[in-house]
Amino acid sequence: DLRMSRGLGDVYKRQELLLDEYEKLFSTRTRLVSVAHVSNVLGTINPVKEMIATAHAHGVPVLIDGAQSIPHMPIDVQDLDADFYVFSGHKVYGPTGIGVLYGKETWLDKLPPYQGGGEMIKNVSFEHTTFNELPFKFEAGTPDYIGSTALAKALDYVSAIGMDKIAAYEHELTVYAMNRLKEIPGMRIFGEAEHKGGVISFLVGNIHHFDMGTLLDRLGIAVRTGHHCAEPLMHRMGIEGTVRASLGLYNTKEEIDALAAGIERVSRMF
């Protein structure tokens, strides 16, 4: 894979990806670029279209993790020219335990099945096995009918609202939240890209993120605490974890005001 650990500090100066530094990481050993479309810690929207073009110029395929982008912005995998694009169901208001893998047909044809079972085999004998056509060769056994139906309904729901409308509304909320939270004494926000997603990670003074999250929960305010499955990034920033507020299409400015008031109330306890 791309040796991101070698140059993470250079690539992510200012907590935004630098394309010229990114290109320096390619070598003859690079086999796949795997990158998040939107950071689930910083909210940074990575320039994946340009990253894909660079990788393809080196003959390297690209997998985009779209878990943090699919619910929040329009996505056109053909325009991006992504070889693979993946996302989880629950991030887009669907059920847990299900997700989507998009792949270019040329790549999916090359890849072997990762599971064996009913429907993924066309013919089988003791001497030879012929796998089924796409997409069935990757769908062994009884499918998750309930999960797939619920996920399809969730995608229909956000599509009916309009992804452009969702993106514009959430950007307005994010700008409002960033400005409001910066007014709080001792506030440190991690990830301040100009065009970022609605993910705001922060610490306040010397208050431990677990303490802040627990007390906000007592006030009826839902946030996430910890390293958010991004422990190497936390080490790079010299912290153990953050409090993370995540904005969605259902949030309001009044709720952001309640979050800010809750943080201020908790801060007075320390």
Labelled PLM ranges:
Residues 6, 62-63, 189, 223:
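Hydrophobic beta-strand scaffold residues
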